[in-house]
Amino acid sequence: MFNNLVWPKIPGIADFKGNYFHSARWDHAVDLNDQRVGVIGVAASAIQFAPAIAPKVRQLSLFQRTANWVVPKANEPYSAAQLDFYRAHPEEVKKSRDETYRVWNSLCTFQDKAVLADIERAGLERLAEVRDEQTRRKLTPNHPFGCRRPLFSDVYYPIFNRDNVSLVTDGIERVTPKGILTRDGVEHEFDTIVYSTGFETTTYLNALEVSGRHGASLRDAWRDGAQAYLGITTAGFPN
């Protein structure tokens, strides 16, 4: 599922004269130190690598189409005092585990409104750490938690407090030989562009060719959605 890259349908990608690559096929031969770097896409991939490259690049511009919910990972290491407490009170370990299960089970089903409200509150509290009001507003989601794939990070929002990091929300018109032209007429010049645009996860059999009678393609037959009798049999194809 996560091996078929998606490249955005933006005109001019091949016209760019600098380095460019997909985040899932990272080009380690490209030295990003002191470079001007543009990142298209700010979801699950970007929140992982953007904080890692921000300290080394000269300028990092992230192009965002839709603001996502980015909430704390809640993955802090246990302190020595906490470890001593759990050793002395093993019954508390089970209570903690049960509470963790309850929260994550509610999160996965998106049915516990109280849990969802707490998560949104935690996300907004972390977002409030972004000092620039305009950037903070651009990063604020306009949809409830769970409508899009939720993201978990403790280090993404802090990069926007760096002087060399900017968030661009104007739509992209095209890629140019020098960089990215946005719909407001501004050309953003870069040395390297990273496409953090995800994977093809919704097309059936996108990495596998199944042929039926007379050379028919199962991928074409299922282009508008997969259908099979009892979930196992499709007319005209091997079953």
Model segments located where?
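Short beta-strand to alpha-helix junction loop
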Residues: F110-I119, P144-V155
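Generic beta-strand/beta-sheet core signal
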Residues: I40, F63, V168-D170, R183, ...
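Core beta-strand elements of the Rossmann-like FAD/NAD(P) dinucleotide-binding domain
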Residues: D31-Q35, R183-T192
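Short, surface-exposed acidic
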Residues: V130-P141
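A conserved short coil-to-beta-strand element within the FAD-binding core of flavoproteins
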Residues: W26-A29, P144-F145, I159, D163-R183
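Rossmann-like dinucleotide-binding core of oxidoreductases
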Residues: F2-E129, V165-S166, S217, A235-N239
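Glycine-rich, N-terminal phosphate-binding loop of Rossmann-like dinucleotide-binding domains
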Residues: M1, A24, D184, T197-G198
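Glycine/threonine-rich phosphate-binding loop and adjacent beta-strand/alpha-helix elements that clamp
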Residues: T192, S196-N239
